[in-house]
């Protein structure tokens, strides 16, 4: 008896006639007048369930098999044979169907064998992975994560685990979750009535990280090429389809690199991940194409086969101003591009991915390298058709005197960045990197409309369930 996954059984990874054991959960059960039950069983390993053919000669047929409903857990043992019906290559002719767990009340079980709204499924996030949509999202997410690690490994990068608890604000925006063990009702105070953070767990104010970039820079300036891939937190009160309070970030950092090399890396990276998902998740993408958003497969294929257009920010603003299109937000130099602007550039002006480069210094972060014009920084955004910005990156400011000016201009506390300044004091070199919200990538590949559906348990303003 060979224990096999549904994926392996359906793909012909086991010789026909082999005695197999398949473990999983019931999707549907159909009974014939001939005294045979056809039970579709899924174990999450692939999109399609496998059909288990259970005859009424099985000893538990009347008592258990005829009472199987969606969600019941079973172990099926029998012979793997070519399927007589349409829709799948193989099925299991059962000698035994062991029922491990019934559903308490099938009528109130949240995941019924029907189509549910995504809004409803967010309220049962602990069960929604049992649906076609979310099991497919999970497989795509897994395959994409594997592709991320494989890409950077093949490119000679080292994976660095940066801290989740930090005293530095990498973005300088102040939208951070505080980490504290002090009594929230009656915290210790200094003589002037302020909270005495010296008595907190870390002896100072601490926060959940908004980015691993600053720490990654330190490692890049010794290891040459590193990347982070981990959870990130933003206390941004944005209740939109594009924002999460907790998400996963991919952040490579490369020593001796400039902005153009950074853009080249971003292009190679995205194409690698898309190729991996297209190659390995075909059944899942077919489902997204048919049931979620038409065109997702073609969009990814075009993305892979396109060269990225590079446009200077100043040029992009001029293009938008001349466009014969009414925008909700008028394009103006010195303001960030809105999603409508980004999509116009990629979908109507160019027709492929765009890298916008050299943004006004006032609208970008303190660590970005100031260009010679004194007005712009060596920053870039990679824009993708259908979604807009998908990657943000920059060449980092490697000159200590300029970095100090930027820290002061942004009103940051210099004492919090002494270690970061050290990187410019001890063998500083030009370096660059970018950041990519992993969930935004999943949204793009799956054709989802809401980023809350791209992560198992979404954390958003007003909600931290499960």
UniProtKB/Swiss-Prot annotation:
* CDD domains, sorted: AsxRS_core, EcAsnRS_like_N
- Give GO MF terms, alphabetically: asparagine-tRNA ligase activity; ATP binding; nucleic acid binding
User: What reactions does this protein catalyze?
Assistant: tRNA(Asn) + L-asparagine + ATP = L-asparaginyl-tRNA(Asn) + AMP + diphosphate + H(+)
Localization annotation: Cytoplasm
> Which PROSITE patterns does the record match to this protein?
AA_TRNA_LIGASE_II
Q: At the top level of its lineage, which domain of life is listed?
A: Bacteria
A Pfam family annotated for this UniProt entry:
tRNA_anti-codon
Any idea which UniProt keywords this protein has? Aminoacyl-tRNA synthetase, ATP-binding, Cytoplasm, Ligase, Nucleotide-binding, Protein biosynthesis
Question: What is the first-listed, main subcellular location in coarse terms?
Answer: cytoplasm
What EC number(s) does its UniProt record assign? Answer: 6.1.1.22
Among Gene3D superfamilies, the record links this protein to: Bira Bifunctional Protein, Domain 2, Nucleic acid-binding proteins
Gene Ontology process terms (BP): asparaginyl-tRNA aminoacylation
The cellular component terms of Gene Ontology attached to this UniProt record, alphabetical and capped at eight, are: cytoplasm
Q: Can you state the subunit structure given in the record?
A: Homodimer.
Which NCBIfam families does this UniProt record tie to the protein? asnS, PRK03932.1
HAMAP family attached to this UniProt entry: Asn_tRNA_synth
> What is stated as this protein's family in its record?
Belongs to the class-II aminoacyl-tRNA synthetase family.
Q: What is this protein called?
A: Asparagine--tRNA ligase
- Organism, by scientific name, is Myxococcus xanthus (strain DK1622)
């Amino acid at each position: 008896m060979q224990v096999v996954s549904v994926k392996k059984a359906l793909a012909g990874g086991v010789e026909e006639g082999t005695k197999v054991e398949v473990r999983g959960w019931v999707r549907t059960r159909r009974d014939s007048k001939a005294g045979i039950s056809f039970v579709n069983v899924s174990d999450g390993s692939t999109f399609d369930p496998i059909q288990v053919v259970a005859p009424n000669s099985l000893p538990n047929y009347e008592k258990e098999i005829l009472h199987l409903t969606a969600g019941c857990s079973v172990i099926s043992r029998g012979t793997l044979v070519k399927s007589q019906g349409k829709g799948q290559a193989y099925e299991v002719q059962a000698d035994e169907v062991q029922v491990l767990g019934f559903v308490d009340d099938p009528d109130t079980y949240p995941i019924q064998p029907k189509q549910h709204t995504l809004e409803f499924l967010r309220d049962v996030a602990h069960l929604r992975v049992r649906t076609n949509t979310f099991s497919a999202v999970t497989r795509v997410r897994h395959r994409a994560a594997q592709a991320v690690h494989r890409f950077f490994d093949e490119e000679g990068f080292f994976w660095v685990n940066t801290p989740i608890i930090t005293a530095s604000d990498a973005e300088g925006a102040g939208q951070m979750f505080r980490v504290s063990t002090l009594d929230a009702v009656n915290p210790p105070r200094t003589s002037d009535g302020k909270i005495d953070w010296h008595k907190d767990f870390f002896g100072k104010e601490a926060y959940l990280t908004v980015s691993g970039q600053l720490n990654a820079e330190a490692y890049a300036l010794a290891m040459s090429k590193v990347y982070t891939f981990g959870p990130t937190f933003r206390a941004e009160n944005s209740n939109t389809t594009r924002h999460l309070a907790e998400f996963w970030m991919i952040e490579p950092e490369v020593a001796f690199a400039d902005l153009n090399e950074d853009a080249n890396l971003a292009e190679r990276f995205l194409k690698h991940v898309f190729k991996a998902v297209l190659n390995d998740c075909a059944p899942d993408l077919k489902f997204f194409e048919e049931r979620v958003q038409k065109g997702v497969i073609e969009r990814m294929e075009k993305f892979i086969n396109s060269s990225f257009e590079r446009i200077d920010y100043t040029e992009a603003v001029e293009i938008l101003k001349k466009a014969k299109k009414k925008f909700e937000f008028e394009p103006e130099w010195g303001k960030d591009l809105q999603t409508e602007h980004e999509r116009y550039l990629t979908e109507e002006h160019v027709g492929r991915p765009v890298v916008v480069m050299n943004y006004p210094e006032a609208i970008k972060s303190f660590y970005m390298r100031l260009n010679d014009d004194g007005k712009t920084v060596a920053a870039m955004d990679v824009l993708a058709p259908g979604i807009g910005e998908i990657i943000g990156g920059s060449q980092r400011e490697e000159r200590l005197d300029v970095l100090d000016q930027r820290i002061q201009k942004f009103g940051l506390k210099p004492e919090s960045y002494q270690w970061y300044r050290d990187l410019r004091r001890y063998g500083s070199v030009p370096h660059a990197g970018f950041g990519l919200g992993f969930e935004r990538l999943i949204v793009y590949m799956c054709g989802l409309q809401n980023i809350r559906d791209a992560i198992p348990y979404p954390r958003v303003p007003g909600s931290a369930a499960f």
